[in-house]
Amino acid sequence: METERTEAKKRAFRVGEKFTTTIEKVAHGGHFIARHEGAVFFIRHGIPGETVIVEVTSTGKSFNRGDVVEVIGPSADRVKAPCNYAHRLGCGGCDFQHISISRQRDLKSEVITEQFARIAKMDLKVAVEEVAEPLHWRTRAILNIDGSGKAGFFGSRSHNSIQIDDCLTCVPVLKLAEITSRTWQPNTKLEISANNSGDRIIANAAVIEGPKELVEVVGANTFQVSHSSFWQSHKLAPAVLTEAVMQFAELQSGDQALDLYGGVGLFTAAALSAVGATGRVDLVEASSSAISDAKVNFGNVPNVNIYLGD
């Protein structure tokens, strides 16, 4: 057995080399685990149970990486990706678009369950619930501007810019098709944000189009959000996450709540409603931009304390 392990370690793979293998299970980060000649590979664009041909994209001491270049035995859950850029030579996002929506949720549940078991030593089964349609949900995007002034996304684990003409995960108000049709300052980046009211910010180190801040509304609460402050990119995530956090927190009137990594105060607002005037909420955040927004959002609330720090 020890001799076999030693021989497996001696096997050196080359970038560009191809082999046939079977995808075993999902891993964190949109990858899938497969093995070949005793070596572990993290594979993109596969589905567990599929027999595939893999091309090696990088090598390492403990594991290697590869892309599926041909599917020999496809899974019943394999579908045609709706986006033209969701492939091995496309942009680095949307790792699961080749998989049916129901199987995507199952795979994400497996990843979270495995993380709790491996890191926290907890036997916790997590179900990923359907929130909304699988496309047109992202309210924020960062685009790379290449040397010719054209906008695009980076390829997977790469600084190569992939020019695009649209992004199907972005909400229509971001107007990605219009953004990518324009010429920008070369070798920079664009940060684009939108809220559910239809306002859009385009920032290139500074805001160059649109309002300086967006106003987000979640339930009865209103938040100022600057372009450099964190806000959930999924348009429905703020409301869904707030409801989940408050269910777990079970805050009562008069309680003291600590909102770590509090951002602009999304959960602080909900916690404040629960603890009432006799309670207190302390928000801690490392981003000076988010802190500035939080002070605007809660500046006149006496029982909310805001701290800059990590």
What do these predicted regions represent?
Residues 2-310:
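Accessory RNA-recognition modules of RNA-modification enzymes
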